[in-house]
């Protein structure tokens, strides 16, 4: 059953990658090929308004603006996500283990979780800004 679930997710991911007309080539590279945008390149680094952050691919709400903070990393950072919106896996791409997180709804890659964030969680969700859509609270 787990193998079947994995295969279905993989097929859906491939379909979304090829057919989502709302995504740029750069977004597709990061969301589906686990790329990384250059640090400091996202306008969301400077976003201070109240609102929420959503997956650029499927629109699921991932973060509340109240959990965003300036980490100094060059990427939009949050100390907490909304409950049950991400799945994680271990990434060894750069020579050591990191925890990578993906949207649970569409399997799109967003970034990595580090254990150097502020309280109350001590976590830093280091997110590629290009993978997020900010929605202003009305």
Predicted regions and their residues:
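N-terminal amphipathic/basic-hydrophobic helices that include classical n-h-c signal peptides
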Residues: 1-15
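A short Gly-Trp-Pro
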Residues: 15-138
């Amino acid at each position: 059953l787990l193998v079947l679930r994995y295969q279905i997710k993989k097929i859906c991911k491939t379909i979304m990658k090829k057919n989502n007309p709302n995504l740029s080539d750069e977004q597709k590279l990061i969301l589906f090929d686990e790329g990384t945008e250059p640090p400091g390149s996202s306008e969301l680094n400077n976003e201070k308004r109240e609102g929420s952050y959503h997956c650029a691919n499927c629109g699921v709400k991932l973060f509340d603006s109240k959990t965003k903070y300036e980490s100094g990393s060059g990427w939009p950072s949050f100390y907490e996500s909304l409950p049950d919106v991400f799945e994680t896996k271990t990434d060894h791409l750069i020579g050591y283990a990191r925890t990578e997180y993906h949207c649970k709804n569409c399997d799109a890659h967003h970034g990595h979780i580090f254990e150097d964030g502020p309280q109350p969680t001590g976590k830093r969700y280091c997110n590629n800004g290009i993978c997020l859509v900010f929605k202003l609270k009305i």
